[in-house]
UniProtKB/Swiss-Prot annotation:
HAMAP family: Syd. The gene is syd. NCBIfam families: PRK04968.1 (NF003439). It comes from Shigella boydii serotype 18 (strain CDC 3083-94 / BS512). Belongs to the Syd family. Keywords: Cell inner membrane, Cell membrane, Membrane. Interacts with the SecY protein in vivo. May bind preferentially to an uncomplexed state of SecY, thus functioning either as a chelating agent for excess SecY in the cell or as a regulatory factor that negatively controls the translocase function. This is Protein Syd. The keyword Membrane applies. Its main location: membrane. InterPro entries: Syd, Syd_sf.
Length: 181
């Protein structure tokens, strides 16, 4: 496990939860995750769940992705998706507004790995360098990804070679995120 990435993710999650508590006097609330089982759920309303992060309980790797492509995945990606269970968190990096993706449960973790495999299949078909997404943007064709060759974080337009460098590594990126409620 990459300790710098794990700590940066935990620190951002704490900043996010603290900001939520400061503004709403509660743990984060999600309508999107209502009805989806998770160890993160504290309580449920008629149409939403209050959640708090919980330690990840499965195998701490994305080996299913590695096996599917017979490649080695950046250790930071293993760490990012297996440090904790949490709800997705809205954030800002410079002037970029994003939704930081998280795994909500062990079932969700399997789904995330399947989506990462699908992403890599498309990149391989288009002969693009491999990246692994960590966040979504309002523009559906853009994501924040980690380059599997260099470990750098970039803003990527899906299906193209268009990439904008954002940070040298995932810990640096996470440390610069600001919670957005």
């Amino acid at each position: 496990m990459d300790d710098l990435t794990a700590q940066a993710l935990k620190d951002f999650t704490a900043r996010y939860c603290d900001a939520w508590h400061e503004e709403h006097k509660s743990w984060p609330l999600s309508e999107e995750l209502y009805g989806v089982p998770s160890p993160c759920i504290i309580s449920t309303t008629e149409d939403a769940v209050y959640w708090q992060p919980q330690p990840f309980t499965g195998e701490q790797n994305v080996n299913a992705v590695e096996r599917a492509f017979d490649i080695v995945i950046q250790s930071t990606i293993h760490t990012f998706y297996t440090t904790q269970f949490a709800g997705d968190m809205h954030a800002q990096f410079g002037d970029i507004k994003l939704t930081l993706l998280q795994t909500w449960s062990e079932d969700d973790f399997r789904r995330v790995q399947e989506n990462l495999i699908g992403h890599l299949v498309t990149q391989k078909r288009l002969k693009l360098p491999p990246t692994l997404f960590i966040a979504t943007l309002e523009e559906e064709l853009e994501v924040i990804s980690v380059c599997n060759l260099s470990g750098e974080v970039c803003k990527e337009t899906l299906g193209t070679r268009k990439r904008t460098h954002l940070a040298s590594n995932l810990a640096e990126f996470l440390n610069q995120l600001k919670p957005l409620l």
